[in-house]
Every structure is written in C-alpha cells, then in structure tokens.
Amino acid sequence: NGFSHQNPGFIDDILRRQSNFSNVYFPSDGNVTLVCLEEMLSSVRQINALVAGKTLEPRWLSTELARQQVSEGLMIWDFASDENPDIVMAACGDYPTKETMAAIDIIKTECPAAKIRCVNVSSLTTMGLGTLRNVATQKKFDEIFTHDKPVIFNFHGYPQTLKSILFNYDVHSHRFDIRGYKEIGSTTTPFDMHVRN
C-alpha cells in the first residue's frame, strides 16, 4: 500500500536510538512469528517491535528450527545453501525472505554451478545483529557472512538503517549490497514496491 503501510520509519527510529533496551523482530514465517511473540511477551524491561505481513506466507522453518533462529537472531539456512559459497544472499523480514528464496531458485536454475549461502536475520538491535540477549559477535558474523565473499542483503527497512548496524562489525562496505525501502512507488503489491525500490 505504498508509503502509508510500508514506511519503515518506526523501525529506523527504534534502531537508531543509542540504547540497549530494544529489539526489532523480523520473522520469516508463521513459526518464527510465534516464537518471536513468545520471546517478546516473556521479556521485561525492554522494548520489542515485530515487523510482519498480514498475508499467509511460505513456511520455511519447523518449530524447532524457528526456536534456533530466534535464539541466535541469524542463521545459515542449510537447506538453501551450498558449501564454500561464491556469494552470500541474506534476508531480514518475511517478504524479503520470500524474494531472496525466489532469487536463489532463479540463480540455481540459470547457473547451477553457482554456490550460494542463504542467511536469514530475524532480529536486530542498535548493538548489532541478533537480540539483546544474544548479539552476534564479530567471530559469529565472520563465520556466517564469510571474510571475503560478496553479500546481497535484502532488508525490510531503509538500507541506511542496516548499514548503521553493520558499522558495529569490522565490515568492508564494498562487500555488502544492501537492498531495502527507498520511498518510490504508490499503492501496489509488496513485490512491485520492491521492484520499484
């Protein structure tokens, strides 16, 4: 629905605060959403926001994997990944995840030899990727995103918001191509908004 429904300004406001009391959850599917809600409702002394669509989306993870995803905040999706990747494709959010999985499928069809790692990020804080209880360390960040491979990151927010969070890590910015919301478009579908942006 364009700017009125897809404006990520609230996400930006939370994640740009200099604080250590807020989490923003970006569940990739219904199972992850349920686990996120469980985490949010059991937490105290922190602000939690959940960013999720209102339509039925693919179910990517079992309940067990959803719990692991939410606990760690980011995870390599082995079922959509290859060993020793040439490129890392990351997603944060339900629609961005669906789009990233479709992109991987297209690449695998057109270029079967391409080795891709699929990474999903389900939560962010001002301090980094993950939750307040489990912010990804530099070591974990490097293990997941590699030291030198290019990363295409599909984000459900302003690209600059994610760039400011990545600043917490020793990252060469030329490796990361962050795709997100740019306020271009009108009342339309999420896919069309992403194409326009």
Show which residues each predicted segment covers.
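Thiamine diphosphate
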Residues: 1-12, 19, 36, 40-197
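Short beta->alpha linker loops
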Residues: 28-32, 95
